[in-house]
Amino acid sequence: MSMIDDLPPLRDVIKRHALSARKSLGQNFLLDLNLTSRIARAAGPLQDATVVEIGPGPGGLTRALLAVGAKHVIAIERDERALGALEEISDRYPGRLTIINADATDFDPRPLLGTTRAKIVANLPYNIATALLIRWLSIEPWPPWYDVMVLMFQREVAERIVARENEDAYGRLGVLSNWRAETKILFDISPAAFVPQPQVTSSVVRLIPRYNPEPCDRRSLEQVAAAAFGHRRKMLRQSLKSLPADPASLAAAAGIDPTRRAETVSISGFAAMARELASIVGSGKRL
């Protein structure tokens, strides 16, 4: 028996359903139910919550979410081999688990949610984690259909997500993440907690959507950040040359010294440059 329910231990579940982790699916199974419970609790009170989980695998986090009281869990799993294990959890928690056999990168849960706001809680497959996060942060209109995300990433990716100006990991991902959400690394998880063991430490990150982010067009923000960090060691007057505006004039119009480098510019600074760029593109003129 596990420590959170009367279902079999995860190692037994994996063996019985022949769930050897597949590298092609970015799978690393987290077997420590104390850790899965900690992740579940990090999403806040779940008693009235609908939770969307990506890549549940044998269901360790799924079980934790249900055991701590989630009203409903929507589990999106691409690997058909895991469906039997998830069905066993569904039988233990009747009416509270919906299992979707789909690829999370092109599945939209909103039709299942209706007007219900959800929480996203997941040990994301490493090979799609960043792409999924960018997708969820790029939702329009904003604010999104979720009110919190608690997600696991490789430590290096987690540091990029939460990084701010003048930090080594600051880049395009940090600009988008911190523009649209309050971000925080909650805790790390050792490779030894997984089967198979990854070669890197993992980190659990919480992202809470900002209902009123700095006003600017998202695409313009991404365009400016991509240009600026594409040549991060160069001054803005050089790195922004790929944009449809004179780079020095664009930065100056946004109140930023064009001799600065991207890594020193705050989220507000990038938003200001994005507003200037959108204005230029909209007017059909070039500064």
Curated annotation (Swiss-Prot):
SMART domains: rADc. Keywords: Cytoplasm, Methyltransferase, RNA-binding, rRNA processing, S-adenosyl-L-methionine, Transferase. Its EC number is 2.1.1.182. GO terms for cellular component: cytosol. One of its GO terms (molecular function) is RNA binding. It catalyses: adenosine(1518)/adenosine(1519) in 16S rRNA + 4 S-adenosyl-L-methionine = N(6)-dimethyladenosine(1518)/N(6)-dimethyladenosine(1519) in 16S rRNA + 4 S-adenosyl-L-homocysteine + 4 H(+). Gene3D superfamilies: Ribosomal RNA adenine dimethylase-like, domain 2, Vaccinia Virus protein VP39. S-adenosyl-L-methionine binds at N28, L30, G55, E77, D103, N123. It comes from the Bacteria. CDD domains: AdoMet_MTases. It is found in: Cytoplasm. Pfam families: RrnaAD. Specifically dimethylates two adjacent adenosines (A1518 and A1519) in the loop of a conserved hairpin near the 3'-end of 16S rRNA in the 30S particle. May play a critical role in biogenesis of 30S subunits. HAMAP family: 16SrRNA_methyltr_A. Belongs to the class I-like SAM-binding methyltransferase superfamily. rRNA adenine N(6)-methyltransferase family. RsmA subfamily. This is Ribosomal RNA small subunit methyltransferase A. It comes from Nitrobacter winogradskyi (strain ATCC 25391 / DSM 10237 / CIP 104748 / NCIMB 11846 / Nb-255).
